[in-house]
């Protein structure tokens, strides 16, 4: 048992598909294409219900596709497209129900079937979904529909609570290691920690994410303008905007906000979706209807200039997503894929320590010690207590009988933490890295009796590596003598 994934639903879905069709590399890609298509169809259907014109729908669908950006998410092959789909549908149905004075005929004082079905999926697809659940439950409570709020929360929490109990009974934490180790939980024992807890972390992360910052500014302006136009708080469009804003601040406060367009993708798509419907009400139906008061022309110019500055980060995201996608696939092939092939060829069923467990464990059948802590409980416990340095790594790898280690010897990873007893056998370095943790992987001898074997294996595998990988170190110097 391993509690390593923050997406329980995606893990279950892939397991079912692999059980039926066998383990393969194509299923994640195909699933992401299917879910992206479902997103486009769902958003299109919702926009049609609001009688938005085809040209307007086309522009926003194009924006959602490339700003989110779906091409990158499809090739990543993880749960993020399904996360976007569930988040959009949940926000749409929640706002629709909250905007009503009374519960629908499908419920006496209970939730509509659509929300009851979606609520457990929201945290199951990613634990960040709990932010959405918290926001919507709070809004139902403010709406004085406490039974609705309670029911929605219970339906959402029961599945992850059952998983948490299962995890605990197996000796792991209640939450997956990935959630605990990657989340932002400030130390409230200090004044700085208290300040971070009350929004400073969110503020800093927003400044580091200009595309999210733009969306927040845009929806705040739209929300304020509509409020001044007598749009009440419980109006459908206002609700979707409010849910997006509060969820974004919670995510930026407590969660990862960037890693190759993954973690913030649902926020970007949700923000664009939340803007689209209420914004249309204030656009002129024809360009001829736009009248410009020449006496305040400088104000128009200033407003246009400000708008361009706000929109630039969005176009920058589109540009870099397109440019970086082929680079990213090359990065994974040159680093993670080659590491997996190397271990598969030479270290079958062998105890190995690594810090990036995904592709390696998919390709090779090894006894893996995850020194980053996602897949190894001993490491996670040490990192949670703040005691994880050279001594702990040396003792743990010795206890586990680890033969070799493949690590990033870089700042933020294992710089200054490599045990002195280990011997570096070599390095692989990729160029133009945009997605891997670091561009250089170091190979270490952990068990001294393995040194000659590791060097021999690296020398043999050196001729199988793509020539774009820069090899160096002890083994490579023997090749080039």
For each feature predicted by the language model, list its residue ranges.
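Membrane-proximal envelope and lipid/glycan-remodeling enzymes
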Residues: 1-481
């Amino acid at each position: 048992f391993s509690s390593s994934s923050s997406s329980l639903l995606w893990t279950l879905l892939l397991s079912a598909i692999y059980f039926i069709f066998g383990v393969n590399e194509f299923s994640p890609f195909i699933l992401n294409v299917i879910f992206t298509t479902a997103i486009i169809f769902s958003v299109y259907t919702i926009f049609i219900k609001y009688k938005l014109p085809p040209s307007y729908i086309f522009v926003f669908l194009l924006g959602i596709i490339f700003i989110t950006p779906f091409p990158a998410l499809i090739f990543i092959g993880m749960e993020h497209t399904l996360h976007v789909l569930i988040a959009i549908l949940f926000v749409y149905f929640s706002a629709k129900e909250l905007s009503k004075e009374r519960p629908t005929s499908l419920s006496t004082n209970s939730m509509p079937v659509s929300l009851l079905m979606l609520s457990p999926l929201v945290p199951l697809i990613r634990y960040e979904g709990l932010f959405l659940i918290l926001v919507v439950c709070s809004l139902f409570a403010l709406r004085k529909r406490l039974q609705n709020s309670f029911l929605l929360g219970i339906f959402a929490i029961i599945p992850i609570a059952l998983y948490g109990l299962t995890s605990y009974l197996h000796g792991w934490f209640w939450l997956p290691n990935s959630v605990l180790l990657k989340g932002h939980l400030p130390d409230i024992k200090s004044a700085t920690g208290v300040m971070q807890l009350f929004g400073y972390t969110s503020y800093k992360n927003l400044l580091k994410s200009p595309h999210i910052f733009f969306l927040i500014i845009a929806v705040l302006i739209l929300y304020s303008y509509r409020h001044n136009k007598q749009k009440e708080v419980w109006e459908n469009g206002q609700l979707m905007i409010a849910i997006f804003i509060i969820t974004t601040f919670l995510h930026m406060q407590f969660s990862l906000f960037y890693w190759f367009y993954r973690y913030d993708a649902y926020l970007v798509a949700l923000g664009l979706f939340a803007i689209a419907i209420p914004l249309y009400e204030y656009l002129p139906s024809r360009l001829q209807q736009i009248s410009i008061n020449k006496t305040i022309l400088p104000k128009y110019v200033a407003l246009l200039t400000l708008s361009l500055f706000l929109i630039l980060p969005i176009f920058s995201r589109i540009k870099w997503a397109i440019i970086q996608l082929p680079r990213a696939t090359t990065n994974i092939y040159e680093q993670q894929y080659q590491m997996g092939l190397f271990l598969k060829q030479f270290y079958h069923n062998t105890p190995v320590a690594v810090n990036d467990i995904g592709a390696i464990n998919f390709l090779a059948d090894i006894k893996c010690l995850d020194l980053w802590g996602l897949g190894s409980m001993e490491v996670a416990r040490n990192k949670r207590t703040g005691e994880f340095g050279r001594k702990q790594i040396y003792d743990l790898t010795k206890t586990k009988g680890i033969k070799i280690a493949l690590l990033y010897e870089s700042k933020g990873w294992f710089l200054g933490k490599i045990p002195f007893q280990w011997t570096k056998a070599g390095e692989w370095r990729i160029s133009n890295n945009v997605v891997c943790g670091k561009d250089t992987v170091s190979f270490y001898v952990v068990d001294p009796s393995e040194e000659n074997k590791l060097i021999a294996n690296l020398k043999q595998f050196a001729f199988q590596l793509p020539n774009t990988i820069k090899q160096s170190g002890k083994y490579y110097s023997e090749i080039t003598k």
